[in-house]
Amino acid sequence: MIIAVDVDGGDYAPKEIIKGALKAAQEYKIGLILLGKKEVIHVHAGHYLKKYPIEIVHCPQTITFNEHAVEAIKGKPKSAIVIGTSLVKQGKADAFISAGNTGAVLAAAFFILGKIDGVERPALGAIITTRPHIPSLLIDAGANAECRPNHLDEFAHLGNIYAKQVLGLEKPRIGLLNNGEEEAKGTKLTLETHQLLKKSQLNFIGNIEGHDISLNKADVIVTDGFTGNVVLKTLEGLGDALLKLRKVGHAIDSAAHLRGRALLADVGLGSMVKGMDFEECGGACLLGVKGTVIVAHGRSHARAIKNAIGLAKRTAEKGVDKLIAEDVRLRTLTATEGEQNHVTTPV
């Protein structure tokens, strides 16, 4: 298993990215391809380069966060994002992860790897854990701001496969994020999507509301990328706030500190904080492209990168992209046969 890692991307690149990659090489026993400035990688990796199966690919160009995605990947073919994605395309890497410009990573995946045949809109699936050891998948977490009902239906099928393979769920519960549980409530988008999901073979449990996310009512939470990204960032912000609250408890006097600890134990805030910590999972997987691509958070430190590499390893080992391709093929075949069965022969 070889994972290509963009060491140029992220607020704390390259030091934290390289540090996390080295931890991953040690823990997961995998090979790495580090993509970035060769001399910089040598400075931060040092003797570890001989200790682990690590290859360096020099990338003289860097795509920054404020660059236009498509223009960047076309104008900077020697950047880590373009080269890393190309390595997956060529079969020289099993997966690629980057904490860099998300739009550029998505664009590179679309143009270089290509969409799986039959998939119209690849989507970002983000694993979230609001209850101890009970993860769920939020899809789309930010790849598609504007969607049609058939796109959300597609996201549900992508998420279903990912939840089965990576989360280990036999029959994932699919929930449609809405402003009410009632079937007749919602926007034109959610109303029409609801009807599509009802007709599907998925384990669709109906609409779920925002508060249901923290109650783990659904294993796969389906929504458009705009809403999904807002939800994801809200959970991250809540996690940060709870973490600060916890730190305040450690900073005050002993008696109050004990009361704070008791409160945390009573309501399980400690576990909740851990679950809402984006570094715990590491990144979101781009589902629907021909290969494994993990988008890590721009604020990723070493721990997040290590975990993102672990997620990439699990996703690639399960062959999620190939399973999605087969699922799309079978559903298309079934739909075609159904249409043919409804064709009447003129008398």
Curated annotation (Swiss-Prot):
It comes from the Bacteria. InterPro entries: FA_synthesis (IPR003664), Phospholipid_synth_PlsX-like (IPR012281). It catalyses: a fatty acyl-[ACP] + phosphate = an acyl phosphate + holo-[ACP]. It is an enzyme of class 2 (transferase). Pathway: Lipid metabolism; phospholipid metabolism. The keyword Cytoplasm applies. GO terms for biological process: fatty acid biosynthetic process; phospholipid biosynthetic process. GO terms for cellular component: cytoplasm. GO terms for molecular function: phosphate:acyl-[acyl carrier protein] acyltransferase activity. It is found in: Cytoplasm. Gene3D superfamilies: Isopropylmalate Dehydrogenase. Its EC number is 2.3.1.274. Pfam families: FA_synthesis. Keywords: Cytoplasm, Lipid biosynthesis, Lipid metabolism, Phospholipid biosynthesis, Phospholipid metabolism, Transferase. Catalyzes the reversible formation of acyl-phosphate (acyl-PO(4)) from acyl-[acyl-carrier-protein] (acyl-ACP). This enzyme utilizes acyl-ACP as fatty acyl donor, but not acyl-CoA. Homodimer. Probably interacts with PlsY. Belongs to the PlsX family. This is Phosphate acyltransferase. It comes from Dehalococcoides mccartyi (strain ATCC BAA-2266 / KCTC 15142 / 195). The lineage of its organism: Bacteria, Bacillati, Chloroflexota, Dehalococcoidia, Dehalococcoidales. The gene is plsX.
